[in-house]
Amino acid sequence: MQTNVLEYLENTVDRVPDKTAFADEESALSFIQVSEQAKSIGTELSRQGAYREPVVVYMKKCPQTIAAFFGVIYAGCYYVPIDEEMPRRRMQLILENTDANYLIYDESTKDKIAALGFEGTALPYETCSKTEMDEEVLTKIREGALDIDPIYVLFTSGSTGVPKGVVGYHRGVIDYIESLSEVLGFNESTVFGNQTPLYLDACMKEIYPTLKYGATTWLIPKSCFMFPVKLVEFLNDHEINTICWVVSALIMISAFGTFDTVIPKYLHTIAFGSEVFPVKQFNLWKMTIPDAEFF
């Protein structure tokens, strides 16, 4: 029985090491690159003394951020993602709430850490992702891991003014991904188009099945969601066939006549949520891509 989400990555590395796992317009990481960088980060965090504690990941949305998440898990810790799109006060409250001693940053965020008042150890991704991995250390950490260990804490929007952390743990994530994948029919040929920020739990629908099946996830630029035609062209350019989006993003495409200009050529699986899908817009989607399945 699988007890650790890292098994998804390790099993896939054995099968398709050089296949693209995560990509955006600027960079891409293969499964072996995700594995190697994550293990290096895990080794560095362990050397720094991190274990069974939160590690904040303060990076822009990119493939390397996802590798950092799994580096934190390799260290036996749990990741807490924050993003420069968040209001500064929100990030400060998250840091106060977690009382984290470690933070991973990249070039885009390094000059913004001081403003958050973080007083712990800040590690640059560019350096710790190149640390020589120590398999002996990582094996020892794994031997002490349990399926009830936390792997992330993601914070809600904070309707009361104070963000609240939601904990994900190995067993819960594994059970969810196994069930979701069975229903939606993911496989090695799945190409996801990610919409949501990496600090929201909605991105789990793409990140973990990608590792499980050796699929591919494209991180779609936020700017695309302002221009429906450009968005559909992005889907076509990268042969994206599966999306798990909020209804408002789907409506933005259908309601503005986008299908008169361009239609999604490869989409066959569309999972939607967050609100009711208006019948008129839903029918437009169904008529445009009649062979697609909607969930």
Where are these regions (language model features)?
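ATP-dependent adenylate-forming carboxylate-activation enzymes
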Residues: 59-63, 77-93, 107-109, 215-238, ...
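Conserved AMP-binding/adenylation subdomain of ANL enzymes
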Residues: 164-193, 201-241
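Carrier-protein-dependent adenylate-forming modules in NRPS/ANL systems
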Residues: 1-172, 184-185, 214
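Short, Asp-centered acidic motifs that coordinate Mg2+ and/or phosphate
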Residues: 93, 101-102, 191, 241-242, ...
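Gly/Ser/Thr-rich phosphate-binding loop
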Residues: 212-215, 240-244, 254-295
